[in-house]
């Protein structure tokens, strides 16, 4: 079964109002999709992370010629060559190959992987809390309230992009508005040192409705994470940008994290991603994959999560939640999969089991012009 055709879909969406995290504000959202078609007409979709002009150039100049004629069932022979050049490109191709093989077998993704242990997966609403507005705190809280009204009861908000005192004011105001009706995780995007991160214990000690403290330190500081975990009042999470399954080993062996957050798009392929999930399970660590970038990688994370054994025997708390981007983002509507009451049912159809919105794909296609409005 050979790859006959490769199509690219660079997608671009200008935001009505810039938003962001500790790394700065975003004026747009982008997504790079690929579609592989075999000589038998079987289709597989993939998603790549990166800068649209660079990704499009790479595919047109050498990735498409490299892929044409390759045997899908010989992936183990040739995909490592692509992984050596670019984990981002290989991740997208790996997703497309997985869908093709599952479709060829007449199976859903989860059945291709051995079957579903959880028919639905909890999701938490993920936010980019900062904006250029003077009243950014109120705007952030309003977004969380909109997610609450939509059925979410778990939320992740950003810290680390303002002073500690300003961020603390924001989080206290958010907790007052939620009135303990929802759980909150804080994501610092690797902004702090150990001393500053521990200052958050003052806030964490006020209430018990917390989930975790995400990447408070640069992820390479294993000793710092181990020290922080010994003294922090919340579980410590991290690892979204780690490039290989082996990269998680120092953090796991040193007991530096309570929760690992593998990201398929950084790990260079579906199997590396799933291996990272099971590695975490073998170490007795909770797992909540990072899935901020696009709807297809999030779908793969949901399906992979559904195949994991439960982390806990506590009824109703057996499987960890997946991130669901709740910001303004038209890219989220590209596939027919949405949460209901903070849960997402796992698709059971052949392949990825969802339909693409072809009109939206056409509407959002990047026209090659500048990214500025």
Which sequence ranges carry the predicted segments?
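C-terminal extensions of enzymes
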Residues: 327-373
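Structured beta-strand/loop patches that form or line metal/cofactor-binding pockets in enzymes
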Residues: 1-45, 49, 325-332
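Hydrophobic faces of well-ordered beta-strands that scaffold small-molecule active sites
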Residues: 46, 123-126, 153-157, 184-188, ...
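Conserved, mostly hydrophobic/aromatic
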Residues: 3, 34, 41, 93, ...
């Amino acid at each position: 079964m050979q790859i006959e055709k490769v199509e690219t879909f660079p997608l671009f969406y200008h935001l009505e109002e810039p938003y962001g995290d500790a790394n700065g504000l975003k004026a747009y959202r982008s997504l790079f999709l690929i579609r592989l078609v075999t000589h038998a007409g079987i289709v597989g979709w993939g998603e790549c992370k990166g800068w649209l002009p660079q990704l499009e150039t790479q595919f047109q100049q050498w990735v498409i010629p490299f892929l044409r004629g390759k045997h899908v069932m010989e992936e183990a022979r040739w995909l490592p060559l692509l992984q050596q050049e670019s984990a981002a490109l290989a991740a997208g191709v790996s997703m497309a190959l997985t869908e093709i093989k599952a479709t060829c077998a007449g199976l859903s993704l989860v059945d291709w992987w051995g079957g579903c242990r959880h028919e639905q997966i909890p999701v938490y609403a993920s936010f980019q809390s900062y904006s250029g507005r003077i009243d950014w705190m109120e705007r952030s809280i309003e977004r969380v309230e909109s997610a609450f009204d939509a059925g979410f009861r778990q939320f992740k908000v950003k810290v680390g992009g303002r002073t500690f005192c300003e961020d603390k004011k924001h989080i206290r105001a958010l907790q007052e508005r939620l009135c303990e009706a929802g759980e909150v995780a804080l994501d610092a995007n690797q902004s702090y040192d150990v001393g500053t991160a521990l200052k958050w214990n003052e806030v964490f000690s006020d209430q018990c409705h917390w989930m975790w403290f995400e990447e408070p330190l640069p992820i390479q500081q294993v000793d710092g994470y181990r020290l922080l975990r010994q003294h922090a009042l919340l579980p410590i999470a991290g690892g979204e940008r780690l490039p290989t399954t082996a990269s998680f080993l120092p953090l796991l062996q040193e007991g530096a994290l309570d929760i690992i957050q593998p990201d398929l798009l950084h790990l260079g392929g579906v199997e590396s991603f799933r291996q990272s999930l099971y590695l975490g399970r073998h170490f007795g660590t909770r797992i909540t994959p990072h899935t901020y970038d696009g709807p297809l990688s999030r779908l793969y994370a949901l399906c992979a999560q559904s195949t994991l054994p439960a982390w806990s025997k506590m009824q109703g708390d057996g499987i960890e939640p997946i991130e669901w981007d709740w910001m303004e983002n038209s890219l989220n509507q590209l596939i027919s999969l949405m949460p209901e009451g903070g849960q997402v049912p796992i698709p059971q159809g052949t392949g990825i089991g969802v339909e693409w919105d072809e009109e939206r794909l056409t509407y959002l296609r990047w026209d090659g012009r500048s990214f500025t409005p």
